[in-house]
Amino acid sequence: MSGAAFPSPTAEIAEMNRIHYELEYTEGISQRMRIPEQLKVAPYGSEDQELPDHELLHTAMMHVPERIIVAGHSDDMPFPRDLDLIQSTPQESTLSLKTPPRVLTLSDRPLDFLEMEQTSSVSHPSEEVRTQTKTRRERSVSENAGVHHNGPLARNDSAFALATLDSTLEGGTDDMAVVDATSLRRQIVKLNRRLQLLEEENKERAKREMVMYSITVAFWLVNSWVWFRR
């Protein structure tokens, strides 16, 4: 006979323990846990009303408390401090918020604009001169208009204003000429530096070519001498 036909004693003991545990578990659940046999949402009919109160209570009634208080039911067990704070603080129905402004102004300009202004002022200095001449013209014209309203000395003052206008125009042209001269001078300096670099590169290239040419000539001379010696 093979040993597989008879179960081992350890397996039998384990099976008995499992059955005993299941019986105890089922007995404990049946004794401690009670659920109603039926639940009804509609009002009770005449048949249900004929039953006694204790049978209704056990068969179809279920009571669920509205709240469960763990602490605070008596003076010995007060509410926790967090709950006291929550109950003491009044709840506000609405929150007060400031309305945003209708117009938003940019007080501080970003740094990119400053860099663009610096580059424009360096690359285009003639624009500043033009604005200065324009302001001078407007000032002279305003002075001339004010003098015209004064009275008997209008002609002399107008001639003086025209003379000042001519002087401002001449000054503006002189300033533009100075700016053009400075820009031309910078361009000439850049061209001179570029030419110097090109000349140095050409000299170095000529030196390299001379060295390579001398090396190739010496190589061919040595080869020819060796060939003649053979």
UniProtKB/Swiss-Prot annotation:
A molecular function GO annotation: protein homodimerization activity
Keyword Heme (UniProt): no
GO cellular component, one term: peroxisome
Segments crossing the lipid bilayer: 211-228
Region Disordered: start-end pairs: 117-153
InterPro entries: Mff-like_dom (IPR039433), Mff/Tango-11 (IPR008518)
Ranges in the topological domain labelled Cytoplasmic: 1-210
Keyword field: Coiled coil, Membrane, Mitochondrion, Mitochondrion outer membrane, Peroxisome, Phosphoprotein, Transmembrane, Transmembrane helix
Domain of life: Eukaryota
Purpose: Plays a role in mitochondrial and peroxisomal fission. Promotes the recruitment and association of the fission mediator dynamin-related protein 1 (DNM1L) to the mitochondrial surface.
Similarity comment: family membership: Belongs to the Tango11 family.
Protein name in UniProt: Mitochondrial fission factor homolog B
Organism this protein belongs to: Danio rerio
Native organism taxonomy: Eukaryota, Metazoa, Chordata, Craniata, Vertebrata
